[in-house]
Amino acid sequence: MGLCKCPKRKVTNLFCFEHRVNVCEHCLVANHAKCIVQSYLQWLQDSDYNPNCRLCNTLLSSKETARLVCYDLFHWSCLNDLATQQPPNTAPAGYRCPSCQGPVFPPNNLVSPVAATLREKLSTVNWARAGLGLPLIEVAEPVDDTMSHDETDYRDWSVVNSSSDNLSETPETTSQTGYTYNSVAPGAVQQSLNGNMSQDHAVTIRDTGSESVPFNAASSPRKVYDTRENARGQDAVIDFDDDKYRRRPTLNWLARILRNRSGSKSRPASSMQRFLVILIIGVLGFLTLILLMSKLGRASADNDPNLDPLLNPHIHVGKE
C-alpha cells in the first residue's frame, strides 16, 4: 500500500513499474496511460517488466493503447484485430485477455476510471457494442461504380428516330387554358368576420374543352380560427386604470368565491370550497344567534317581578 502523489492523496496498491511511484486510478488514466502498472506486491516480487505489446512485440508508446480491468496493457489496434478474428456469435464471456485470460468486458457494477475509459473505447467497435448491450453501428457499404460510361446500347435508336419523325410531321397545336375564380365579395367577407360565421366559398377552375372542377373551401386543409373567443377572453381580464382605486365592497371576496368565474369549466375543488364557506357561515350565524338569545333572556329575567324574592309572599325576610 502506498500514497499517490497527486492532489487527491489517495491510498492505493497500484505501482508504476516505469516511474516507480504509487499511482491511483485517476493518475493511471491521466498520466500513465502507456505505462506498465500492476500491484505493489508484484513489484516487490519481480521488478522487471516488458515495455512491448505482447501481441505485436513493439513498444507500447508507439501506438494507441487500451488497458483492461486486469491492468494489462495492449495496443488498441492489436486487441481489436484479435477480437475481430473471433466468430460473430461469440458470447461476451468468450473475449479473454491474451495475458491472464481475464474478461475483456468490465462488469456492469464496476465503477472506476479505468473501467469507464475501457467502456468508452469499446463502444467504438461493433463486436464490443454487442457485449456492452449497445446498438450496433451501421456501416455504409461502398457502392462499386464498375459500369463503364462508354457502353451504350444502340439497338433502340431506330425506334427513337422513327418516333421523332412522327412528332415532327404532326402539326403543333396549342390551346390556352382559362381559369375563373369565384369568391365572396370583400363586403361579405368583412361582414362574416364581424358577426357571422365564415361561409363556405367555392373556387372553380374552367379549362377550355374540359369540364370544370370545383374546389370547396370547406374541404381544404386550411384551419379557420375564430378570433372572437380570444377577444372575449381579453375583455374579461382587462384591468382599467379607473378600477384600480375604486373602493371594493366589504363582502367582495365572498362574492368572488361563490361566483363560478370559469363558466361551465368549473374546477373540481370549487364545489367543495363553496360548501365549506357556507358551512362556516352557518356555524358562525348559529353561534351568534345563541349568544344574542342568551343575552336577551338574561335581561328579561332581571326585570321580571315574579322572580324577585322580596315580592314573593312565601318568603319572609327579617322576620322571626
UniProtKB/Swiss-Prot annotation:
InterPro entries: ZFPL1, Znf_RING, Znf_RING/FYVE/PHD. A zinc finger (B box-type) spans 1-43. Residues 296-320 are lumenal. It is found in: Golgi apparatus, cis-Golgi network membrane. This is Zinc finger protein-like 1. It is a single-pass membrane protein. GO terms for cellular component: Golgi apparatus; membrane. A zinc finger (RING-type) spans 53-101. Keywords: ER-Golgi transport, Golgi apparatus, Membrane, Metal-binding, Transmembrane, Transmembrane helix, Transport, Zinc, Zinc-finger. One of its GO terms (biological process) is vesicle-mediated transport. The chain crosses the membrane at residues 275-295. Belongs to the ZFPL1 family. Required for cis-Golgi integrity and efficient ER to Golgi transport. The gene is zfpl1. Residues 1-274 are cytoplasmic. It comes from Xenopus laevis. One of its GO terms (molecular function) is zinc ion binding.
